[in-house]
UniProtKB/Swiss-Prot annotation:
Subunit and partners: Homodimer.
UniProt keyword annotations, A-Z: Chaperone, Cytoplasm, Stress response
HAMAP family for this protein: GrpE
First-listed, main subcellular location of the protein, grouped into a coarse class: cytoplasm
TM helices/strands, residue ranges: none
Compartment annotation: Cytoplasm
Name the UniProt record assigns to this protein: Protein GrpE
Organism of this sequence: Photobacterium profundum (strain SS9)
Length: 206
């Protein structure tokens, strides 16, 4: 092999070496780019999973809050319904009881207290009325006996109006039937006779 051939062979070998080195460098660069892209993709995947987890946690928290709120609403509605049922039952019972109280009061008022034979019976009726009244008062029943009070249509029902020189106009002169309220609500207005100015007199309230 002469020098020229050897030179050509060396050049060819050098060229192949350079090409091989360039190929290896390109492959290494490709591997580096691919690894970086995979890392970015993995990070994006993890971020997406984290966001999804956060959304699921928030959804679960919202569900818990809604369940608690609904439970509280159910509890409150139940309490209201129970209270309504209790008040309705108590109101109904009281309305049925009022005529009994009225009859006991009338029996005492009309009884001949001078009759010794009736004395023990009257005392028994008075004790019964007192016990019954004290019992129903514990449940919020209050009696209205508005003699001498100014007439109030919210609490009184005027059965008649009479002239009177002894009473201020619009004053309850007589109670025909006592009124009652239960826990602050009127269940029966008092039936009353109301005064008005006597004919020929001057109404100072006018």
């Amino acid at each position: 092999m002469n020098n020229e051939d050897k030179k050509l062979q060396d050049e060819q070998l050098q060229k192949e070496t350079v090409e091989a080195a360039e190929t290896v460098s390109a492959e290494e660069e490709f591997v580096e780019i691919t690894a970086e892209e995979m890392q970015i993709a993995r990070i994006a995947e993890l971020e997406a999973a984290l966001l999804s987890s956060d959304a699921k946690v928030k959804e679960a928290q919202d569900n818990v809050l809604r369940a608690r709120a609904e439970g509280e609403n159910v509890r409150r509605r139940s309490e209201v319904e129970i209270d309504k049922a209790r008040k309705f039952a108590l109101n109904k019972f009281t309305e049925e009881l009022l005529p009994v109280i009225d009859n006991l009061e009338r029996a005492i008022e009309t009884a001949d207290k001078n009759d010794e034979a009736l004395k023990s019976m009257i005392e028994g009726v008075e004790l019964t009325l007192k016990t019954m009244t004290a019992t129903v008062e514990k449940f919020g029943l209050k009696q209205h006996n508005p003699v001498g009070e100014v007439f109030n249509p919210e609490f009184h029902q005027a059965m008649s109006i009479q002239e009177s020189a002894d009473h201020e106009p619009n004053t309850v002169m007589l109670v025909m039937q006592k009124g009652y309220e239960l826990n602050g609500r009127i269940i029966r207005p008092a039936m009353v006779m109301v005064s008005k100015a006597a004919a020929g007199s001057v109404d100072m309230q006018a």
